[in-house]
Amino acid sequence: DYGVNVRVYVPERRNGYGVTVAAIDEIFEDYFPQLVITVDCGISNAEEVEYLKESGCEVIVTDHHELPENIPDCICINPKFEDGYPYDNLCGAGVAFKVACALNGKSAYKYLDFAALATVADSVPLMGENRDIVAEGLKLINTSPRKCFSNFLTKTQDGADAHTLAFTIAPKINAAGRMGDAASALALFSETDEKAVFELSARLTSYNQERQLKCDELYNQAKAKLSERGAYGRVIMLWDESWNSGFVGIVAARLAEEY
């Protein structure tokens, strides 16, 4: 819509979180952007932003995480700034959606379904503006669902709700990144060919099934270590270099709830 050539870079978990020098170098191996816009990261990457600027491009950071002492020297959009914005608990995609609204007005509302899914998946409080985003996004999903959503919904469902987003759709989308293929989730959202959408949906469903098996395996290993070593008072500390970083958070949450 703005006459620009846009490319999307999705980092893999193995490359670290947020804006990293390795990610920047990888981007510049393929092309030389004039502008880099971050989504859901960057507010804590002042040094990396400087590295980007030294590489010859401008930077806009859009993020929702807590503000560090050292803010990047660039345009930063974050609801945590004390600048009068009335709601500070948006998720990263919620911030991106608000940027789209600022640029495109009501025509950006067609992306409310994506913003709703991300809001639920990121476990931010379903209050205030988040509640509105999810409610309106669900209306879109239930009246004119995109293929990337409808392939995950059963024919017998009366309609999708927040529970559907959290436990039916989000795990399959997240599984792509956990299995080292985050680009497949992006491809699913941007693909228009019906056959390709179906194949990508099937791939993500398969990833999620594999992810569940891997998590169960890691959980059993962690339980064995816990039985052997015990806890430190009310603290459980377990570690194994073979454990996949994409699964440890899920297993840790499971153990925390159990104990």
What feature does the model see in each segment?
Residues 46, 71, 90-93, 97, ...:
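Amphipathic alpha-helical transducer elements in NTP-driven molecular machines
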Residues 20, 38-90:
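Histidine/acidic-residue-rich, glycine-tolerant segments that coordinate divalent metal ions
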Residues 1-35, 55-56, 104-259:
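Hydrophobic helix-and-loop "lid/oligomerization" segment in the mid-to-C-terminal part
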Residues 70-121:
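Short alpha-helices
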Residues 10-14, 66, 95:
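A short, conserved beta-to-alpha structural element at the edge of catalytic cores
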